[in-house]
Amino acid sequence: MQEEWLFINTHKNNPYYNMAMDEALLNLVSQGALPPVIRFYGWAPKTLSIGYFQKLEKEIDLDKVNAGGYGLVRRATGGRGVLHDKELTYSVIVPESHPMMPESVTAAYKVISTGLLEGFKNLGFQAEFSVPRTKEDRERLKDPRSSVCFDASSWYELVVEGKKIAGSAQTRQKGVILQHGSILQSIDVDELFDLFIFSSERLKERMKRSFYSKAVSIADLTDEEITIAMMEEAFYEGFEKGLDIKLKPFEVTAEIEQEVSVLIEKYRSEEWLKRR
């Protein structure tokens, strides 16, 4: 009999709510109050999220972010900057002790990302796992030249035709794995790169050309319109098949929303945003 996990779709929300909900669910799974959870969500306004270890004022053009009315939030996970707009965002929250979850981060990535792989298959795309093949590729992951996510594929992220199509980040806290990531419906590369600081315009253009060669969205792969609703259905079924689980739709309770409202203040605070 398949194990039952909870499924939550919170749709579009502000960036502080999105990050607070991930943390609240992590806490509840850690306490044993909830079984493993898969959540889908979106962003309003469109938002630049930065990794836990990124240096805000060194890497991000805050004037452009503010002038454009973008949301801005620091994630609890590592990785690089992501502009969240036309995408389906997912999070998987599961105990480290779960029999399905390997101890190593990269191996756990592969298990969780199997759900993404099956989701892309449901949409008709032959995605595959990226594996950095050379020592140079592996070293580059440790010391990335770019602040922009999707500029390179990490271990077991998803690529189509050699280009990264889903970017994910993972953290482990309180005995729980939280992996969340972006599945790109479409992307505006010029808009994305305008939000980051580069030492010269020449470097910016070079990095942008490199990005075009390494990243792709669903809209780049097909003339058919793939809606967010179609993506939700494809990846819902993909996670069920890839992880061999049964998803049970779950409505967020008032108690969970109360914890989220407290955590929102953390993610909204200058202290959290400017911690590095």
Curated annotation (Swiss-Prot):
The keyword tRNA processing does not apply. One of its GO terms (biological process) is lipoate biosynthetic process. The active site is at C149. Keywords: Acyltransferase, Transferase. Catalyzes the transfer of endogenously produced octanoic acid from octanoyl-acyl-carrier-protein onto the lipoyl domain of GcvH, an intermediate carrier during protein lipoylation. Belongs to the octanoyltransferase LipM family. Monomer. This is Octanoyltransferase LipM. It comes from Macrococcus caseolyticus (strain JCSC5402) (Macrococcoides caseolyticum). The lineage of its organism: Bacteria, Bacillati, Bacillota, Bacilli, Bacillales.
